[in-house]
Amino acid sequence: MRNRFILATIGLCAALLVLLNRLPALAQPASVATGSGGAVATVDDRATRIGIDVLKAGGNAIDAAVATAAALGVVEPFSAGIGGGGFMVIYNKADDQVITIDGREQAPASANVEMFNDPNTGELLPMSPNRISSGLAVGVPGTLLTWTEALNRYGTLSLAQALAPAIALAEKGFSVDATFAKQVQDNQARFAAFKSTRDLYLPTGAPPIVGSISKNPDLAKTYRLVAKSPNLFYRGEIGKAIVQTVQQPPTVENPPFVVLPGAMTTADLNDYDLHVRTPVAIDYRGYQLYGMGLPSSGSITGGEALEILEGFELDRLDRPQALNKANSNLKCISA
């Protein structure tokens, strides 16, 4: 009977996991952590700990995923947040079914290519800072609906319960690490162009130092409000504030670069449509991999990479050679 390899987390890493299982063994250092009953992996140990605590308290994988994602919105706001979008790949053991939730951002209904042109010259505006540090590139967010859909289908916690640890983290604050400090430092000029962003990340006029405490009371307030009613985000006061910010970016007086408004309207928020999709299924050397389909390309390109690698006997190569073969293949697929 064919083995089944099921990935039930946010994101798609299954292809690489299976590939590594096929590579020759290499001496490994002792594990730094072991356990059973579940695992959580993120880029930040505080968010990871929140997910583990949810599991220890009896929550399931979906409860932990939402709580962890909300915490990442606090400690890793530059790449994760309630104002963005994403995907979920979920395996439900009860019915042996894999589903995917597509909560990616969507372009406003009136968006068009001309909006990215300089109104004075007609030339395409530079990507940074003009196009990405303005209202132009802001899509209609789907993260919150992704969380609520997953919890409603498979969770055991309410949205309020899942958001509670992140609310506490945002209110009490957290120690700034090197990654957070560098992100602010690298983007200082852009952050300083917007009053609210400046006040949050540059309260002293300079980037925070490692070890200082960062708080985000406005995010905590937002989490509290949507915990009571997610509709506030799409059809209530939060939605109106989002649209106002997109259409009238809160810049400082005389910002250092041109900041243009975006096209999002309250109708765009109201009309946002979440999609529950059939996953992409890939067979690889007796394993079955599931991942996100379009508009994500990860599973499709990953499947192409694995199809190519099936032509090589990786287990007959030493590990560095096998990894080089795999990396070269992935680079070609991603090009």
PLM regions and their residue ranges:
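Bacterial N-terminal signal peptides
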Residues: T9-R22
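Internal alpha/beta scaffold segment
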Residues: V280-I282, Y287-A335
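Ser/Thr/Pro/Gly-rich low-complexity linker/stalk segments immediately outside membranes or between
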Residues: L23-A27
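Residue-level micro-sites within transmembrane alpha helices that shape
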Residues: N3, L20-N21, I62
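Noncatalytic scaffold domains of N-terminal-nucleophile
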Residues: Q28-R49, D53, A61-I62, V66-R235, ...
